[in-house]
Amino acid sequence: MSRQVVRSSKFRHVFGQPAKADQCYEDVRVSQNTWDSGFCAVNPKFVALICEASGGGAFLVLPLGKTGRVDKNVPMVCGHTAPVLDIAWCPHNDNVIASGSEDCSVMVWEIPDGGLTLPLREPVVTLEGHTKRVGIVAWHPTAQNVLLSAGCDNVILVWDVGTGVAVLTLGSDVHPDTIYSVDWSRDGALICTSCRDKRVRIIEPRKGTIVAEKDRPHEGTRPVRAVFVSDGKILTTGFSRMSERQVALWDTKHLEEPLSLQELDTSSGVLLPFFDPDTNIVYLCGKGDSSIRYFEITSEAPFLHYLSMFSSKESQRGMGYMPKRGLEVNKCEIARFYKLHERKCEPIAMTVPRKSDLFQEDLYPPTAGPDAALTAEEWLGGRDAGPLLISLKDGYVPPKSRELRVNRGLDTGRKRTTPEASGAPSSDAISRLEEEMRKLQATVQELQKRLDRLEETVQAK
């Protein structure tokens, strides 16, 4: 009798554990917008989620530990004049978050340690360049202050947030229709996009050239998502001609046929992929689903291995994904999701069961830390670098707030209307400076006199 050989994997028994009620964020009005975004962004300090708001766009930012019922009068980030569609935390500054909105603008905000005490209406910088709503914002993974935005004008802009200037533009000649998704490669050298024209493209953004593209990675008409995974591969989610949901793995050098193509079910929600490069696990979260599927990617056939599925009763309106440095390593937590319900946000921990309480080095290789490997100028000049890695063996403590430095004279934001804001000093400021200069000159003269008297005394002795 033949014996079936089961593939060995340390992630075969990963299981999901939803947080208890007192560890959730209750009574929040999650956005009803139909845009296919996660509507939630998390980091080791804060959880942010897009909310329903009257009179414009708003999103809520809470300190990670501030769980329980959220006060209905809690201060929010509310500078946009139309609904917010996407939010993303800066990977190199846990206090900085970017937002894209239907008002055609991108705004970058600085959140104080401890969270907001008053509504935040003035961004650090406003980035205006799109002519239609902005549905995607994505920070460069290794270069400081480099932010990408994609709008429904079919244009991708890459911004230097430090100057408020769009330094790169990929126009509608690259994407002739709506852009569904954009993902940076791990070193930030390339981006991967999916578009309504049913093509997935690999693009070198600094040159504006298409390195590779695949027409119809999935035969269906519903939106496709694409992300980079390990070893020069990309993973796509989409629909078959019969409207079955699919996941596929591709070698970017040979896009003729997929390395693996699997059909999942017939649900209609778009599958949002989240890839963990440390474990090579990809998690698929469908909007409107009540489950999270996860697969392991390997370097040998069949390449994409189904692991398991976490299921719950209520469907999800969105999902946030915690960076690895925000996990509890002493509990063997390898991923944590923040599931948006209609009126709450629920953390879900993905855990590998282990008997030992010691640090599990095989689960936690060195991971991307909070420091940038490059400046914006270095990356724009052609340099590439992988993320600067840190060890989680002794845990991770988020650093104190880092100031986001912006050259305000180049900021194109709407609030730069006063002379002080535009960089030109007022007459009052000039008068104060002149008075301080006179005082300094008088002090220097007095010190010089004292020094002369001291020298005369020394010479007399």
From Swiss-Prot:
GO annotation, biological process: actin filament organization; calcium ion transport; cell migration; cell-substrate adhesion; cellular response to interleukin-4; early endosome to recycling endosome transport; epithelial cell migration; homeostasis of number of cells within a tissue
Posttranslational modification: phosphorylation at Thr-412 by PKC strongly down-regulates the association with actin. Polyubiquitinated by RNF128 with 'Lys-48'-linked chains, leading to proteasomal degradation.
Modified residues (Phosphothreonine): 412, 418
Tissue and organ expression note: Expressed in brain, thymus, spleen, bone marrow and lymph node. Low in lung and gut.
InterPro entries cross-referenced by the UniProt entry: Coronin, DUF1899, Trimer_CC, WD40/YVTN_repeat-like_dom_sf, WD40_repeat_CS, WD40_repeat_dom_sf, WD40_rpt
Superkingdom of origin: Eukaryota
Chief location bin: cytoplasm
Modification sites for N6-acetyllysine: 449
Compartments where found: Cytoplasm, Cytoskeleton; Cytoplasm, Cell cortex; Cytoplasmic vesicle, Phagosome membrane
Coiled coil: 424-460
Protein known as: Coronin-1A
